[in-house]
Amino acid sequence: MSFNPELATKTLEAEGLRCPEPVMMVRKTIRNMQDGEVLLVKADDPSTTRDIPSFCRFMDHQLIAAQTDQLPYQYLIKKGLE
């Protein structure tokens, strides 16, 4: 799937934050979302390229797209597996 930020229902600006803050903020934000909603995460910490996909697998969310070729890194996360 190509990266389409318009799919997002919420946006989390995590630029300038360092590990583990971006993933902690993703977890807090996604907790208050409904299943099926999509979160756009913008971050510039290189560890997010590893941590966000791992978070999605561990917490049963879908990483539907990622753009990590340039800063800020951007991720589209769909809450839940459905």
From Swiss-Prot:
PANTHER family: SULFUR CARRIER PROTEIN TUSA, SULFUR CARRIER PROTEIN YEDF-RELATED. Pfam families: TusA. Sulfur carrier protein which probably makes part of a sulfur-relay system. The active site is at C19. SUPFAM superfamilies: SirA-like. It comes from the Bacteria. NCBIfam families: PRK00299.1. Gene3D superfamilies: TusA-like domain (3.30.110.40). Belongs to the sulfur carrier protein TusA family. It is found in: Cytoplasm. GO terms for biological process: tRNA wobble position uridine thiolation. This is Sulfur carrier protein TusA. Keywords: Cytoplasm.
